[in-house]
From Swiss-Prot:
Annotated function: Participates in the reverse transport of cholesterol from tissues to the liver for excretion by promoting cholesterol efflux from tissues and by acting as a cofactor for the lecithin cholesterol acyltransferase (LCAT).
Superkingdom per UniProt: Eukaryota
Organism in which the protein naturally occurs: Sparus aurata
Record carries keyword Repeat: yes
InterPro entries in the record: ApoA_E, Apolipoprotein_A1/A4/E
Name of encoding gene: apoa1
Family annotation (PANTHER family): APOLIPOPROTEIN, APOLIPOPROTEIN A-I
Name of the protein described by the UniProt record: Apolipoprotein A-I
Location(s), subcellular: Secreted
Family as reported in the entry's similarity comment: Belongs to the apolipoprotein A1/A4/E family.
Region (10 X approximate tandem repeats): 64-260
UniProtKB keywords: Cholesterol metabolism, HDL, Lipid metabolism, Lipid transport, Repeat, Secreted, Signal, Steroid metabolism, Sterol metabolism, Transport
Length: 260
């Protein structure tokens, strides 16, 4: 499978890549192994997710066997990686020892090359800066011309819009006043109707309210001269009568509201 072939190739690459590492390569080699572990885990998880996409019942046994096979291959690769690691370390140490002089000489050559290229690097920097200045000189007039025209167009648009906006404000104010003129009679009509209805209700309810107030005053006056038991005996019939009259008031109000 591609999974196994790719994993084995990466596994061997970690060992062979050790020959090109610098003096701090042991940590780099460990890092490469850690990256390989993460990659192998990701490939395994992706493969299992792909297998789990087979939802049809006829694939159930095949899906189980394939998932088990992927887990076994992952375990085998990890085992092989563990057995290869000592050989990789030994090979790396040998290569680093054998190539020590060559690497040191190469570092010296690289530093010398870097020093010799410094003047050319500065010259290259100056050439690039000159080219950028040429481009800037060429493009600046075009940009300035565009900006000037754009500013002029915006100013012209603003000039054209000013009278339109003033006319629009005037029309809006006139429309508001016109709407108010049409709306106010409607509001007054509603207010008059509500006032009339409330006045009618007040006239209907007023006799009952007055009678209720007189009865309450009578009960209060009697409460000042009789004992509690006698007061309770006298109040009970009045309370019942008040309940009946209050119910009548509510019925009148409800009927009046319904008619409106």
């Amino acid at each position: 499978m591609k999974f196994a072939a790719l994993a084995l190739a990466l596994l061997l690459a970690v060992g062979s890549h050790a020959a090109s590492m610098q003096a701090d390569a042991p940590s780099q080699l460990d890092h490469a192994r850690a990256v390989l572990d993460v990659y192998l885990t990701q490939v395994k998880d992706m493969s299992l997710r792909a297998v789990n996409q087979l939802d049809d019942p006829q694939y159930a046994e095949f899906k189980t066997n394939l998932a088990q096979r992927i887990e076994e291959m992952y375990t085998q690769i990890k085992t092989l990686q563990g057995s290869v690691s000592p050989m990789t370390d030994s090979f790396y140490n040998t290569v680093m020892e054998v190539t020590k002089d060559t690497r040191e000489s190469l570092n010296v050559d690289l530093e010398a090359l870097k020093s010799s290229l410094a003047p050319q690097n500065e010259q290259l920097k100056q050439v690039i800066e000159k080219h950028l200045n040429d481009y800037r000189t060429l493009l600046t007039p075009i940009y300035n011309d565009y900006k000037t025209k754009h500013d002029e167009e915006m100013a012209a648009l603003k000039t054209r819009l000013e009278p339109v906006m003033e006319e629009l404000r005037t029309k809006i104010q006139a429309n508001v006043e016109e709407t108010k003129a049409v709306l106010m009679p409607m509001v007054e009509t509603v207010r008059t109707k509500v006032t009339e209805r409330l006045e009618s209700l007040r006239e209907v309810v007023q006799p009952y309210v007055q009678e209720y107030k007189e009865q309450m005053k009578q009960m209060y006056d009697q409460a000042q001269t009789v004992d509690t038991d006698a007061l309770r005996t006298k109040i009970t019939p009045l309370v019942e009568e008040i309940k009946v009259k209050m119910n009548a008031i509510f019925e009148i109000i409800a009927a009046s509201v319904t008619k409106s």
